[in-house]
């Protein structure tokens, strides 16, 4: 975004910064406007370093380019959300919008701020306006950032889409029409890379499929199982056939599936072959299923999604059809007092009935919090209410937020939340409704910091914990408030001289850059993201003691895998390493890491 200065002399964001967006969005945003003026002022009054009205720029112009080839993009639509400004770029990718003349009486016009290339169009009762660029076949580029100055060229970079396309072939040599193909992408959540399910498409009459508007990254493909409904080949009452799910390049296991690495603008061909197999009726009795209860049933072959069964509440059985193989069938109920069960099932050339599944109530785990605070006076307050009763909160229940998430890829949410207080004196923290599985503990505190969290010998700040049937080992948490302090400077920004005759203001500025404090592997510490002010400064008054690698980037890094030691090894020679003791105040200087590094 382009940074601007409002009428009261405070500064606002300066450079064109574009957030990372999903592949389906083909737009580039450039902040141009807005702010509500608090009085009638002239352009000359806005600040001592502002341009005079007769020096105001008369237009905003620029070029839309391909961020890979840097070639101009012709006939790209550039416009504001309200379409007050809108036009197609010419054959050289250029666009230019005429701007209204500065009006000192109404308080509209352009103002140049203290930092280089700053400009803001403001209106007395305006709202934020962004320039967006659209072009079929292009995406937003999350790694690029442009700067512009009044009357100068603004460059908006778009990223060419990547494509995965292919053909599905059937062992019967029939046309694979209507086969569902699904894509999975590797994305970072809470600092951990995970495989997440994406969109699905159906093959056309030629068995072809196509995934468009893909950003650079890692992908996997799979087909959903489908039945052979050919009326000519199907005999009433006879054997039924289907096509089991297949993972690219032709394996039955998600973990063994090949990873497709895509670069910007790249097209990859990925063909899949399906084998027709006999399907057999399967049935699994549920001992304590409810007649009207809802139940989620999942089926795993080797590992991963693909097969499906359903629950028949009338007969209290899990039913469906599967091909030959060994399966793990899991079932879970919803809501309070939820339960789960698991059985193994083998299908070998005939209808199969599994052993009876017994649903067992999910586990609850107590959290024992030990406070080692040096500051005894804390004025935090809060209440809990269910609409009928209201209780005041005390102790860790007031300041400690506790959550869990599945530790493994593609795992469905398995519950796990803090039990509401049962009365005004109930300060106990209990994680309830935890189904069997592996979990990651997530802790955030509004007071002090989490010094340690363990479950037996397991360090929950770095390792997952396992919940089995009847798990009751408590989680022990230690809280402290002797945090460290960190001040720093991004030297690349701090040494950039301002424009001639200009001053720099960091008040209300949007960040010039972002600093990430990444705890070193297996050590104490807590990840932090810090904003860098216009003068290159950043600070954190509440750093958890520990060792960190401090990294600085021009743009936000939402996909930084800070919990993945192997992935973060790429930054072993970048940034600065600091060691913070309890209560220590430290200062650090770092340089920006360019998008090409």
Stretches found by the model and what they are:
Residues 1-26:
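N-terminal secretory signal peptides that target proteins for export/translocation
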């Amino acid at each position: 975004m382009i940074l601007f200065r409002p009428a009261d002399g405070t500064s606002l964001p300066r450079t064109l910064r574009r957030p990372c967006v999903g592949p389906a969005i083909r737009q580039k945003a450039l902040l141009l406007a807005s702010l509500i003026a608090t009085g009638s002022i002239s352009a000359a009054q806005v600040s001592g370093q502002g341009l005079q009205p007769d020096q105001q720029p008369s237009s905003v112009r620029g070029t839309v380019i391909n961020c890979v080839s840097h070639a101009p993009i012709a006939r790209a639509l550039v416009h504001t959300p309200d379409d007050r400004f809108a036009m197609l770029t010419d054959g050289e990718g250029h666009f230019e919008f005429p701007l209204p003349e500065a009006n000192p009486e109404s308080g509209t016009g352009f103002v140049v701020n203290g930092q280089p290339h700053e400009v803001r169009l403001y209106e007395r009762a305006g709202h934020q306006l962004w320039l967006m660029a659209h072009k079929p076949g292009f995406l937003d580029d999350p790694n690029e950032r442009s700067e512009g100055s009044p009357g100068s060229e603004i460059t908006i970079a778009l990223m060419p889409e990547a494509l995965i396309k292919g053909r599905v072939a059937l062992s019967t040599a029939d046309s694979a029409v209507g086969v569902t193909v699904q894509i999975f992408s590797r994305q970072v959540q809470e600092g951990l890379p995970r495989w997440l399910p994406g969109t699905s498409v159906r093959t056309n009459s030629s068995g072809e499929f196509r995934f468009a508007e893909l950003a650079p990254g890692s992908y996997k493909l799979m087909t959903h199982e489908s039945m052979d409904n050919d009326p000519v080949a199907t005999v009433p009452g006879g054997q039924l056939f289907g096509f089991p799910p297949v993972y690219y390049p032709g394996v039955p296991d998600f973990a063994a599936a090949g990873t497709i690495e895509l670069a910007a603008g790249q097209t990859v061909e990925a063909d899949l072959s399906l084998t027709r197999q006999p399907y057999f009726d399967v049935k699994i009795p549920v001992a304590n299923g409810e007649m009207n209860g809802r139940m989620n049933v999942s089926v795993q072959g080797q590992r991963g999604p693909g097969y499906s069964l359903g629950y028949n509440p009338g007969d209290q059985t899990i039913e469906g059809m599967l091909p030959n193989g060994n399966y793990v069938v899991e079932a879970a109920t919803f809501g309070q007092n939820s339960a789960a069960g698991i059985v193994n099932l083998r299908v070998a050339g005939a209808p199969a009935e599994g052993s009876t599944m017994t649903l067992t109530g999910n586990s609850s785990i107590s959290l024992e919090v030990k406070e080692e605070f040096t500051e005894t006076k804390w004025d935090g307050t809060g209440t809990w209410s269910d609409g009928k009763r209201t209780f005041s909160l005390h102790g860790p229940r007031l300041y400690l937020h506790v959550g869990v998430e599945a530790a493994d890829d593609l795992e469905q949410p398995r519950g796990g939340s803090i039990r509401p207080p049962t009365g005004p004196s109930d300060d106990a923290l209990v994680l309830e409704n935890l189904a069997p599985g592996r979990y990651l503990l997530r802790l955030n505190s509004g007071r002090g910091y989490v010094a340690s969290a363990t479950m037996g010998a397991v360090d929950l700040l770095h390792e997952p914990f396992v919940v089995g049937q009847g798990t009751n080992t408590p989680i022990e948490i230690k809280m402290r408030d002797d945090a460290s302090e960190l001040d720093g400077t991004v030297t690349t920004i701090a040494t950039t001289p301002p424009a001639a005759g200009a001053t720099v203001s960091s008040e209300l500025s949007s960040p010039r850059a972002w600093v990430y404090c990444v705890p070193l592997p297996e050590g104490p510490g807590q990840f932090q993201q810090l904003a860098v002010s216009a003068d290159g400064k950043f600070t954190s008054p509440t750093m958890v003691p520990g060792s960190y690698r401090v990294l600085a980037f021009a743009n936000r890094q939402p996909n930084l895998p800070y919990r993945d030691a192997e992935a973060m090894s790429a930054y072993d020679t970048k940034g600065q390493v600091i060691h913070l003791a309890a209560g220590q105040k430290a200062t650090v200087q770092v340089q920006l890491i360019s998008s090409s590094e």
